[in-house]
Each structure stands twice: as structure tokens, then as C-alpha cells.
């Protein structure tokens, strides 16, 4: 596997490439053209500029997160083919620039949902958190206003102000979309893009819905083992794979994370590994990556990835705000650097333990 860090670009990220380069074991970044609207084509020139900037810092672009899917594609509206054609052109340009991993999601309206961006933990750090009670007590239109004050002056993915300003229109677009229709639209999209993925060896890695259940009555389908296996079977192509995000699938305590990993052997193209601390099944907060700080056994998650021969990019996910850092919530430098080092340490211990066991 290759340890990476998510980076939003020098215009939007408080973390610099030079800082990322100094994290032991991190050799690449997962990045995006953050100022490109969903549905627009990524030009080769912009991709080349992005790669050159990353390479100048001694790193490389290990993958893209995300090439966002336009709502016309998710809803199956009359103009979806225009936006799919643009998506295919973007994939072709990425392939020509030797980029072979694209993380994306198929979540309606909201990318991910948290009700707090700065919940204080016992150690004084602040973290992202979710309570179903808070969601049930608020209108979708008021959701952005309720959390925007804790964004630290940054623009968070999936919560862009210009998108949130259209939230009523977005909900209207999805009023006739249920789980089955969303699956149909995902299948149509995947069938259209697989030829260009085959041509350029591009692995599409769908990100799970977060949290892994319906929010505000919206359909959510990438939520559990059964549904993800269905997605892979309906478009049975090795380039149709997943981003295994422990912190997203893990929002539903019924999901057995190590078992899911083993069932997805060969189709996990990218991994996000983080920990959550549950106060109840629908009240959780993000924790340090260390197993004892949260609910998940991080050793077992990494062991499962090792056992299936996972060799793709991996990254620590949302970090705490610690040591006075002011950054995009979840995406500061310090705690993610600690997380990367911890995950690398687990991997090295597992790898050497297996090797020494084999020698005996």
C-alpha cells in the first residue's frame, strides 16, 4: 500500500505540500481541481499544472478525490448524457496524464453530513460529530447555517455556499428518486464510463454514503456489504470498485468492517482509515486513529487490508484539531500526520509479523 494525504490545492488548503512531504512514509497526495464545478471538463493543461506543482514538492498525484458527479446524472434527468460525456472526457484527460484512480460518490444533495464541526473531546481537541436527534430537529435549509460558523473560514467539500443556496431546488430534483432509481442511474453511469476506464486503466472507487443511512428522507445506497456487492455485480468490471472508508461504513455499527474488507478483495482501489467514538448508535464523534481512542479495532482493519493483498493508496481520514491549529475541520496537518504514522506502524508490524511467522 502507499500512504497518502488528501490535499485540496494551494489555493484552498491550509496545509502545504512541503509540510506533507515531511510526514514519514507519505509519498503521494490525493487531490482535485477544487474550483471546477461538477459537470465541467477537466482540461489536460489544468491536470498537468496540478501534477507539476505536486512533483516540485517531491510528491506525486496518487489519485483524484473527487471528480464530482453532476446531479443530472444521479437523478437521470434528460440532460444526463451531456454531463456523462464531459465526465468521460475528464477521465480520458486524467488517463493521458497517467492518473489511474478516481474516488467519487453518488450521494444525493449532501456529500457527507455532520451536525457539529468542533465538538470538544475530553483531551481538549475538537472533532466532527453527528447526532440523529439534531438532524431530526432541523430543516435541511438550515443545516448549512447551523455548522458554517465552525468552518474556520474554509470551504468544505459538499457544503459549498453556492450549492447550499440552491438546496430547495436540489431536494425538488430528488423528490421522485428512491433507492432503486438511484441504483438504476448509478448502473447507467458506470456502464457508460467503463470503456474509457478500461482503455486507460482507471480505477473508479465509489465512496460510501456518510452516515450510512437515509438523511432527511434522501435515498442512500452505498451503505453496507449487501449493497456494495450488488453495485459490483450489476457492472462486473474490475475497474468498478470502492473506496473503503472505515469512518463512513462504520457509522452503522451493524457493518463488520474487517469482514467487509475481506469480501471486497480485488475491488478495493483506495482506503480511508479512521476511528469513531460512539455515545449511542446514532450519536458518534470522530476520534484519534488509535484503537483505544475510539470504537474500532484499527489493527483488525489494517490486518484485513493486508490479508487481501491491498496495494493501493491509503490515507488517514478526518483528524482532530489539536495544538492550536486552525484549518478546515477534519483536514488539519497535525492529527492526520499522527494518523498516517500510526497506520504505517501498524502495517509494518503486521507485515514483519507475517514474514517472521512464515520463516518459522
Residue ranges and their predicted role:
Residues 109-164, 223:
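Aromatic- and acidic-residue-enriched segments that line the glycan-binding/catalytic groove
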Residues 28-30, 63, 103, 205, ...:
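Conserved beta-strand positions in the central sheet of alpha/beta enzyme cores
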Residues 104-108, 208-210, 317-319:
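Short, well-ordered beta-to-alpha junction loops that form the rim of enzyme active sites
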Residues 13-17, 23, 41-60:
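Glycine-rich, positively charged N-terminal anion/phosphate-binding segment
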Residues 1-4, 9-14, 51-55, 72-76, ...:
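Histidine-acidic metal/acid-base catalytic patches
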Residues 32-49, 216:
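Glycine-rich, proline-tolerant flexible connector loops at the mouths of alpha/beta enzymes
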Residues 22, 58-74:
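A short glycine/small-residue-enriched secondary-structure motif
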Residues 66-73, 105-114:
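Aromatic-lined carbohydrate-binding surfaces of glycoside hydrolases
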Amino acid at each position: 500500500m502507499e500512504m497518502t494525504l488528501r490535499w485540496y490545492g494551494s489555493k484552498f488548503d491550509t496545509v502545504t505540500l512541503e509540510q506533507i512531504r515531511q510526514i514519514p512514509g507519505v509519498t503521494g497526495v490525493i487531490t482535485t481541481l477544487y474550483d471546477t464545478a461538477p459537470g465541467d471538463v477537466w482540461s489536460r493543461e489544468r491536470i498537468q499544472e496540478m501534477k507539476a506543482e505536486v512533483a516540485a514538492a517531491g510528491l506525486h498525484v496518487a489519485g483524484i478525490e473527487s471528480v464530482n458527479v453532476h446531479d443530472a446524472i444521479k437523478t437521470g434527468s434528460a440532460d444526463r448524457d451531456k454531463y456523462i460525456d464531459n465526465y468521460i472526457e475528464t477521465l480520458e484527460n486524467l488517463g493521458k496524464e497517467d492518473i489511474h484512480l478516481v474516488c467519487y460518490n453518488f450521494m444525493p444533495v449532501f456529500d457527507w453530513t455532520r451536525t457539529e464541526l468542533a465538538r470538544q473531546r475530553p483531551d481538549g481537541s475538537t472533532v466532527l460529530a453527528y447526532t440523529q436527534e439534531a438532524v431530526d430537529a432541523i430543516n435541511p435549509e438550515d443545516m448549512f447555517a447551523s455548522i458554517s460558523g465552525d468552518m474556520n473560514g474554509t470551504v468544505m467539500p459538499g457544503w459549498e455556499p453556492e450549492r447550499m443556496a440552491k438546496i430547495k431546488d436540489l431536494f425538488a430534483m430528488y423528490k421522485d428518486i428512491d433507492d432503486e432509481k438511484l441504483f438504476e442511474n448509478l448502473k447507467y453511469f458506470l456502464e457508460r464510463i467503463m470503456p474509457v476506464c478500461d482503455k486507460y486503466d482507471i480505477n473508479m472507487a465509489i465512496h460510501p454514503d456518510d452516515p450510512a443511512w437515509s438523511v432527511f428522507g434522501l435515498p442512500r445506497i452505498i451503505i453496507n456489504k449487501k449493497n456494495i456487492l450488488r453495485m459490483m455485480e450489476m457492472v462486473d468490471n474490475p475497474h468498478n470498485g470502492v473506496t473503503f472508508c472505515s469512518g463512513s461504513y462504520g457509522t452503522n455499527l451493524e457493518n463488520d468492517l474487517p469482514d467487509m474488507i475481506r469480501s471486497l478483495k480485488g475491488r478495493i482501489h483506495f482506503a480511508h482509515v479512521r476511528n469513531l467514538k460512539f455515545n449511542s448508535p446514532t450519536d458518534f464523534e470522530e476520534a484519534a486513529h488509535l484503537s483505544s481512542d475510539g470504537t474500532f479495532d484499527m489493527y483488525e482493519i489494517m490486518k484485513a487490508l493486508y490479508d487481501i493483498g491491498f496495494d493501493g493508496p491509503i490515507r488517514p481520514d478526518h483528524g482532530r484539531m489539536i495544538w492550536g491549529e486552525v484549518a478546515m475541520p477534519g483536514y488539519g496537518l497535525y492529527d492526520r500526520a499522527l494518523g498516517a504514522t500510526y497506520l504505517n506502524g501498524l502495517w509494518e508490524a503486521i507485515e514483519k509479523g507475517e514474514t517472521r511467522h512464515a520463516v518459522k
